[in-house]
Curated annotation (Swiss-Prot):
Positions that bind Fe cation: 92, 94, 153
Entry's EC annotation: 1.14.11.-
Co-factor requirement: Fe(2+); L-ascorbate
Gene Ontology terms: biological process: DNA damage response; intracellular iron ion homeostasis
Pfam families hit by this protein: 2OG-FeII_Oxy_3
Name recorded for this polypeptide: PKHD-type hydroxylase Sala_1910
Residue sites binding 2-oxoglutarate per the record: 163
Coiled-coil ranges (or none): none
Amino acid sequence: MFKLVQLLGDNAVRALRDIAASGTFVDGKISNPHSRVKNNLQLHDAAAYERSSKILLDAMIQNADFMEFSFPARIAPPLLTRYTPGMHYGLHPDAAYIPLPDGQLRTDVSCTIFLSDPADYDGGALHVQLGNADLRFKEAPGVAIVYPSHTLHEVEPVTRGERLVAITFIQSLIPDVQQRNLMHELNEIAALEGGKMEPANYTRLQAVQYQLLRMWRR
């Protein structure tokens, strides 16, 4: 299960593009030196990283769709990455844990935030294998795709222009993907239909929601 989220407005997208334009990028293997499939660039500028990650983190925690889909306990500071012609990121799952200054983060949910206009580059689609479905995403600036970190995915080769995105990983309060999906579905039903229910039945539904969260939260 995945979700597309309108995460950023035009002003935030412009601010992130400006940060990227003046920031220093290095070989993406600096953070994954043993990868045989990673071929991109990533921001390597402490001040720019701090500014860009704050913009993105603020947007995430203020976005109800993002929060209600991922149930975040911790969010890794988002990182700007760039692809120019010839670059790609071959098929891979995300690592189970990533190191952070305050300790390892378990990667339950992955997120890519698109910052380039799709018309400004060719290729570069995010290809995600979800079950038997092969899905490709090349979204408008400011849109985020959120999906389970264990899924196989790749960035197809860029053949023209520049693909600028931000990526991050989420440790979820509900690490089991099936339980997380069920909780999200139940919450959506409650939000959509709760106002039409008899008060007593809505109270019972809330009790089920709360008890499942108690059972599944880690």
